[in-house]
Amino acid sequence: MEIICLSDTHKLHRDVRVPDGDMLIYAGDITFFSRRPSVLTDFNDWLGQFPHLYKVVIPGNHDTLLQDEANRRKITNAHLLINSGVEVNGLKIWGTPTTGLTSGAFAVPDDIARTEIWALIPADTDILVTHIPPARILDGTPRTAEHAGCESLRNSYRRIRPQATRFRARS
């Protein structure tokens, strides 16, 4: 199965060239703190034009609109995963938008609370989609040598050992 992954288009999704594949995974930041639900409608229409058999989306920390259930219903051309999973073509996929940030959408600054969220991830998950990286796995920041990943998420990786993972990166 050919899986295409992208993220962080911040309302510029129509400017991105998306290769064909079997599955399209979008790992968050559809918007940039937009308050206009029409942005989600446009994103959903954009998703609908692609031939990928399966499409999976998680929100990111800039997707405050998706904290509202009514706005979540605007995403109909993909499986929208918010601390939830879906099985497609025999693959168990889990998606979580949770971040360790102190503000923004889906922010959970308390490590103990995040650990409880990560505990929801089934051990038999094949593909894990997150908006933040686990600690010390491709988590270097571009401007400093600091690691921005989440230690409790890294511990969950050790428990789950998914076949594949996708967390946000530059698109």
Residue ranges of each PLM-predicted region?
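Core catalytic region of metal-dependent phosphoesterases/phosphodiesterases
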Residues: 6-88
